[in-house]
Amino acid sequence: RTAGKGRVEFKIGDAEKIPLEEGIADAVIGNMILHHCPQPKSAIREMARILKRNGRLVLSDLEKHREEWLKNEMADIWLGFSPLKVKEWFREAHLKAIEVLPARSKCCGVSLAGRKAAIGIFIAKGVKG
């Protein structure tokens, strides 16, 4: 389909210092980025900052877990997050209509030593007020 051709722009950058002006994005979508951010709360606040009024933020990431090997082998900084903490961060970023729900799938990986992990995933959604 070409109906929306030219209306989507992809940007690569630091989630904690997005090089865009405030209120420019209709939507921000992030997949498995928070657990790699030194300050995930700041990343959420920054993503909310660039949203237009009624713009939507949708993130998926790992639920809290104990697979320490992911820090060394996958450059994870955080071992997932609790839904309550993510909801709190969305609220502090002045988002409304917040939902943090479990996804119907797992993030699976195998360590260099053969350890297997199947970690729950959440999907968090919010709307800029």
Where are these regions (language model features)?
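Short conserved AdoMet
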Residues: A3, P38, K52
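Conserved SAM-binding strand-loop segment of SAM-dependent methyltransferases
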Residues: G4-I18
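Conserved Rossmann-like nucleotide-binding pocket used by diverse enzymes
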Residues: K11, I29, V58
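A short acidic, Gly/Pro-enriched loop at the edge of an enzyme's catalytic core
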Residues: E16-V28
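A short SAM/SAH-binding and catalytic strip from SAM-dependent methyltransferases
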Residues: D26-Q39
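Short N-terminal helix/helix-N-cap motif within the alpha/beta-hydrolase-1
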Residues: P38-S42, E67
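A short glycine-rich, Lys/Arg-flanked "PGG" loop and its adjoining helix->strand segment in the class I
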Residues: K41-R56
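C-terminal alpha-helical "lid/dimerization" subdomain adjacent to the S-adenosyl-L-methionine
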Residues: V58-A118, I123-K125
